[in-house]
Protein backbone atom coordinates (compact mmCIF):
# COMPACT_ATOMS: atom_id res chain seq x y z
CA UNK A 1 0.00 0.00 0.00
CA UNK A 2 1.32 3.45 -0.83
CA UNK A 3 0.25 5.30 2.31
CA UNK A 4 -0.03 4.10 5.86
CA UNK A 5 -2.76 5.90 7.76
CA UNK A 6 -2.07 7.68 11.02
CA UNK A 7 -4.03 6.55 14.04
CA UNK A 8 -5.28 9.08 16.61
CA UNK A 9 -3.48 8.77 19.93
CA UNK A 10 -6.73 8.07 21.79
CA UNK A 11 -7.29 4.86 19.83
CA UNK A 12 -3.79 3.99 18.72
CA UNK A 13 -4.30 0.40 19.85
CA UNK A 14 -6.96 -0.43 17.24
CA UNK A 15 -6.54 -4.12 16.48
CA UNK A 16 -7.95 -6.14 13.61
CA UNK A 17 -8.94 -9.68 14.56
CA UNK A 18 -9.94 -12.17 11.88
CA UNK A 19 -13.18 -13.88 12.92
CA UNK A 20 -13.95 -17.58 12.89
CA UNK A 21 -17.08 -19.67 13.34
CA UNK A 22 -17.13 -19.14 17.12
CA UNK A 23 -17.64 -15.41 16.47
CA UNK A 24 -20.83 -15.86 14.43
CA UNK A 25 -23.26 -15.09 17.32
CA UNK A 26 -21.58 -11.72 18.02
CA UNK A 27 -21.34 -10.94 14.30
CA UNK A 28 -25.08 -11.61 13.92
CA UNK A 29 -25.95 -9.29 16.83
CA UNK A 30 -23.79 -6.55 15.31
CA UNK A 31 -25.36 -7.22 11.90
CA UNK A 32 -28.85 -6.76 13.38
CA UNK A 33 -27.79 -3.42 14.85
CA UNK A 34 -26.33 -2.41 11.48
CA UNK A 35 -29.61 -3.28 9.74
CA UNK A 36 -31.51 -1.13 12.26
CA UNK A 37 -29.09 1.79 12.05
CA UNK A 38 -28.99 1.93 8.26
CA UNK A 39 -32.79 1.67 8.13
CA UNK A 40 -32.68 -1.40 5.91
CA UNK A 41 -35.87 -3.26 5.05
CA UNK A 42 -34.15 -6.56 5.88
CA UNK A 43 -36.55 -8.46 8.20
CA UNK A 44 -34.08 -11.18 9.30
CA UNK A 45 -33.89 -12.19 12.95
CA UNK A 46 -30.61 -12.72 14.81
CA UNK A 47 -30.84 -16.54 14.38
CA UNK A 48 -31.42 -16.06 10.64
CA UNK A 49 -28.49 -13.65 10.49
CA UNK A 50 -26.32 -16.25 12.24
CA UNK A 51 -27.10 -18.76 9.49
CA UNK A 52 -26.43 -16.19 6.79
CA UNK A 53 -23.15 -15.16 8.43
CA UNK A 54 -22.09 -18.80 8.64
CA UNK A 55 -22.72 -19.11 4.91
CA UNK A 56 -20.71 -15.95 4.23
CA UNK A 57 -17.74 -17.21 6.24
CA UNK A 58 -17.89 -20.63 4.60
CA UNK A 59 -17.74 -19.14 1.11
CA UNK A 60 -16.00 -16.07 -0.23
CA UNK A 61 -16.10 -13.71 2.77
CA UNK A 62 -13.89 -12.97 5.75
CA UNK A 63 -15.08 -11.10 8.83
CA UNK A 64 -12.93 -8.97 11.11
CA UNK A 65 -13.52 -7.53 14.56
CA UNK A 66 -12.20 -4.11 15.52
CA UNK A 67 -10.79 -4.14 19.05
CA UNK A 68 -9.77 -1.21 21.25
CA UNK A 69 -8.57 -1.71 24.83
CA UNK A 70 -9.78 -5.34 24.74
CA UNK A 71 -13.31 -4.25 23.75
CA UNK A 72 -14.85 -5.31 20.43
CA UNK A 73 -16.07 -2.01 18.98
CA UNK A 74 -17.31 -3.23 15.59
CA UNK A 75 -16.75 -5.48 12.61
CA UNK A 76 -16.33 -5.66 8.86
CA UNK A 77 -17.37 -8.31 6.35
CA UNK A 78 -15.18 -8.38 3.24
CA UNK A 79 -15.70 -10.30 0.01
CA UNK A 80 -12.24 -11.55 -0.82
CA UNK A 81 -12.92 -13.09 -4.24
CA UNK A 82 -13.14 -9.88 -6.24
CA UNK A 83 -10.88 -7.03 -7.21
CA UNK A 84 -11.12 -4.54 -5.76
CA UNK A 85 -12.27 -6.19 -2.56
CA UNK A 86 -15.89 -5.56 -1.60
CA UNK A 87 -16.75 -4.31 1.89
CA UNK A 88 -20.24 -5.76 2.35
CA UNK A 89 -20.75 -4.74 5.97
CA UNK A 90 -19.03 -2.24 8.23
CA UNK A 91 -20.30 -1.50 11.72
CA UNK A 92 -19.09 0.45 14.73
CA UNK A 93 -21.07 0.08 17.96
CA UNK A 94 -23.24 3.07 18.80
CA UNK A 95 -21.31 3.89 21.96
CA UNK A 96 -18.03 4.10 20.02
CA UNK A 97 -19.14 6.51 17.29
CA UNK A 98 -18.29 10.20 17.08
CA UNK A 99 -14.68 9.81 18.30
CA UNK A 100 -13.16 8.81 14.94
CA UNK A 101 -13.35 5.14 15.85
CA UNK A 102 -15.01 4.32 12.51
CA UNK A 103 -12.40 6.23 10.56
CA UNK A 104 -9.56 4.58 12.45
CA UNK A 105 -11.12 1.13 12.09
CA UNK A 106 -11.53 1.61 8.35
CA UNK A 107 -7.94 2.81 7.88
CA UNK A 108 -6.63 -0.04 10.05
CA UNK A 109 -8.65 -2.51 7.95
CA UNK A 110 -7.21 -1.16 4.69
CA UNK A 111 -3.71 -1.46 6.13
CA UNK A 112 -4.40 -4.98 7.41
CA UNK A 113 -5.77 -6.07 4.02
CA UNK A 114 -2.89 -4.29 2.27
CA UNK A 115 -5.16 -2.65 -0.30
CA UNK A 116 -5.54 0.86 -1.60
CA UNK A 117 -8.93 0.37 -3.27
CA UNK A 118 -12.16 -1.15 -2.00
CA UNK A 119 -15.81 -1.05 -3.07
CA UNK A 120 -18.85 -0.48 -0.85
CA UNK A 121 -22.61 -0.03 -1.17
CA UNK A 122 -24.56 2.39 1.02
CA UNK A 123 -28.34 2.53 1.23
CA UNK A 124 -29.55 5.83 -0.21
CA UNK A 125 -31.64 6.55 2.90
CA UNK A 126 -28.67 6.03 5.22
CA UNK A 127 -27.61 9.67 5.39
CA UNK A 128 -25.12 9.26 8.26
CA UNK A 129 -23.51 6.34 6.41
CA UNK A 130 -23.31 8.29 3.17
CA UNK A 131 -21.69 11.25 4.97
CA UNK A 132 -19.22 8.94 6.71
CA UNK A 133 -18.07 7.23 3.51
CA UNK A 134 -17.88 10.50 1.58
CA UNK A 135 -15.73 11.96 4.39
CA UNK A 136 -13.28 9.12 3.73
CA UNK A 137 -13.06 10.03 0.04
CA UNK A 138 -15.53 7.57 -1.49
CA UNK A 139 -17.26 8.70 -4.69
CA UNK A 140 -20.49 7.38 -6.16
CA UNK A 141 -19.77 5.19 -9.20
CA UNK A 142 -23.15 3.53 -9.77
CA UNK A 143 -26.73 3.55 -8.60
CA UNK A 144 -28.56 0.38 -7.53
CA UNK A 145 -32.34 0.55 -7.86
CA UNK A 146 -35.31 -1.68 -7.00
CA UNK A 147 -38.90 -1.91 -8.17
CA UNK A 148 -41.36 -3.24 -5.66
CA UNK A 149 -44.92 -3.80 -6.90
CA UNK A 150 -47.58 -2.73 -4.47
Model-derived features: positions:
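Conserved beta-strand in the GNAT
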Residues: 65, 71-79, 86, 91
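Conserved active-site alpha-helix within GNAT-family acetyltransferase domains
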Residues: 103, 124-143
Amino acid sequence: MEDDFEIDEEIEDMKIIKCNSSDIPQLAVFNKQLIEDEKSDNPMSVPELEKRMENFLNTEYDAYFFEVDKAIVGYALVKKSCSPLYLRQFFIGREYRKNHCGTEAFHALLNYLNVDSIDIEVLSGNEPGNRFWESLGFKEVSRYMRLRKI
